[in-house]
Amino acid sequence: MNSLAAVRSEPSPAQNRPQSRAFPSAAPGPRLDALTGLRWIAAFAVFVYHARLFLPLPHMTHVAPMGNTGVTFFFVLSGFVLTWSFVKTDTAPRFYWRRFARIWPALAVSTVLAIPVFYYGRGIPFDAMSQLGVLASLTFVQSWFPSIMFAGNPAAWSLSNEAFFYLLFPFLIRPLLRLRVRWLALLAVALVTFNIGLRWWGYGADLTAVQATYLFISPIGRLAEFVLGMTGAAAMRRGWRVPVPVSLATVAVGVVLAIIWYDSSHPDLLSSVGTESPLANGMNQLMGALYALLIVAVATRELTGKPMFLRTRLMVTLGTWSYSFYLIHATVLYGLSEIWFGRQPPSWSNVPPLLLSLAIAIGLSAALYRLVEHPAEKALRSMLTRPSARTVSTAPPRNERAS
């Protein structure tokens, strides 16, 4: 969910040469700043998705909801970055501690800020059940229980999924890195096919709300997206480079989003039992594959050293704050709606309060990053340093913090 600034170092020529060993390098891959910038775009898309509830713009009714696929992007990116930065000598306990240090401090503070907005501000009693939901959120288990999935800080539900992915990562990474590129390609195709097939089956099945949640939202239902990101990074660590330019990958993402938009903007295409047609349903699942394509295309281009807008100081800075932004943006939107603008009809007059809400969310995310996320992560990571080895660097694997 991004702290994304890692220790800067230049890749050696050996790091960029195709390799064929089971573990191409014991060291992590070179830092990929463009992925940090790309992460900001996904976080902004999620902001737009939630902002549409309060400050919709004309002709954007069916466009803004597509921002929800930004979460899919996060899951794919997480698998990619953790695999790209994996060090052969790393241990599961150290990995778990680094991930805890990475995501928990900002989660805790953002949850404290969210409680007045999502409970007292909306007239929801903060009783024992609500407190249990907050505890579940702070311990990364809320997405296993549909009734409390959005407890505490609602945006944090995806962290429960991420925590499950982190739990499995040490057991998945070594077998995955032993696979040759052809087998990784087959695995990627199988993951995408499984995702689309599962969604289409679920669309036509008579599922209860609980069953649908486990199928489409729970950690089990989203695991394939994380593993898909892992396969892309594993292939690149073996020297594979996608022969698709960033521009073409971007167009592919845009085309599928346009299909989803067209489909959702024509009610006659919708099923009487859902808000999406089978076409939109399948296209939504295809987004995971296209985001994986976009990520490896961006990574491939950056490894060539060519300039990219995503690597500019502005984009990298915003990407660095994006985890805090993701955690705080919904609290800002819901909070301002309670004390100021409420829920407005579509209008261009919503632009000023929308921009102000965005500015406030960015400002608070910068503060949360500088005052909590970064210093707390640094302090917690320092506990991994053994007293007898203070001169040995304990910096995280380069680029791991982008996940």
Protein language model regions, located:
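Transmembrane alpha-helical segments and their boundary/interface "anchor" motifs
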Residues: 39, 68-75, 86-120, 128-137, ...
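Functionally critical transmembrane alpha-helices in membrane proteins and complexes, commonly lining
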Residues: 30-87, 104-111, 132-146, 152-154, ...
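Aromatic-enriched alpha-helical transmembrane segments of multi-pass intramembrane proteins
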Residues: 36, 61, 129-159, 163, ...
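Alpha-helical transmembrane segments of polytopic integral membrane proteins
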Residues: 76-79, 83, 169, 229, ...
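Juxtamembrane interface at the ends
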Residues: 204, 292-308
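C-terminal "closing" transmembrane helix and its immediate cytosolic amphipathic cap
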Residues: 1-25, 308-315, 330-403
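Functional transmembrane helices that form membrane-embedded active or gating regions
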Residues: 24-44, 62, 95-97, 102-104, ...
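Membrane-water interface at transmembrane helix exits
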Residues: 52, 83-87, 114-118, 122, ...
